Amino acid sequence: MKISIIGISQLTDFVLDNIINYSDEINIYSDSRNFDFENKNLTKKNVSIFTDKNIDDNLNKICKTSDVLFFLSDSDPFNVFSYKKCLMYNPSTKSVFQATDRDIYEMYKDKKYPVISPFNLKEDDYLYLIKE
């Protein structure tokens, strides 16, 4: 199973630690370098970290080559837009996105979207994507 994570935020480490044993290939894409995150995960053999200034332009390829996608940037508009764009490219891709604003999180949660948030995070909110 190929898992892709788009964005490095406070949730990325937590999610990565919980999914690391479920995949032989985890690719993490960020538009800027996070040296603390990179150094912490340098020795993990199944994790690759890519800096890509044009993530939005390469989203089609990422969506089509991933079995599971996590949109975990600190930008709620980017996460929501990318999630919906990915559904257009590949409707069968399993994905979840982060909403850091409580109102946005609750709005999407009420509409039954696959959304997670740092202030109300449960492993069950995203691990079902990998265990299916």
Where in the sequence are the language-model features?
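Cytosolic regulatory regions of ion transport systems
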Residues: 1-132
